[in-house]
Curated annotation (Swiss-Prot):
Pfam families: PetN
InterPro entries reported for this sequence: Cytochr_b6-f_cplx_su8_sf, Cytochrome_b6-f_cplx_su8
Source species of the chain: Aethionema cordifolium (Lebanon stonecress)
Key word Magnesium present: no
Gene field: petN
Protein name: Cytochrome b6-f complex subunit 8
General function of this protein: Component of the cytochrome b6-f complex, which mediates electron transfer between photosystem II (PSII) and photosystem I (PSI), cyclic electron flow around PSI, and state transitions.
UniProt xrefs under HAMAP family: Cytb6_f_PetN
Molecular function (Gene Ontology), one example: electron transporter, transferring electrons within cytochrome b6/f complex of photosystem II activity
Record-stated family: Belongs to the PetN family.
Spans through the membrane: 3-23
GO cellular component: chloroplast thylakoid membrane; cytochrome b6f complex
Subcellular location: Plastid, Chloroplast thylakoid membrane
Assembly and interaction partners: The 4 large subunits of the cytochrome b6-f complex are cytochrome b6, subunit IV (17 kDa polypeptide, PetD), cytochrome f and the Rieske protein, while the 4 small subunits are PetG, PetL, PetM and PetN. The complex functions as a dimer.
Lineage: Eukaryota, Viridiplantae, Streptophyta, Embryophyta, Tracheophyta
Membrane topology: Single-pass membrane protein
Length: 29
């Protein structure tokens, strides 16, 4: 696994995590 794919994987994890936090925050949980 090279550094580019690792960086993309990390970026997707952070993006998905922050997006789910926003959704949960708006739904009142």
């Amino acid at each position: 696994m090279d550094i580019v794919s690792l960086a993309w994987a990390g970026l997707m994890v952070v993006f998905t995590f922050s997006l789910s936090l926003v959704v949960w925050g708006r739904s009142g949980l």
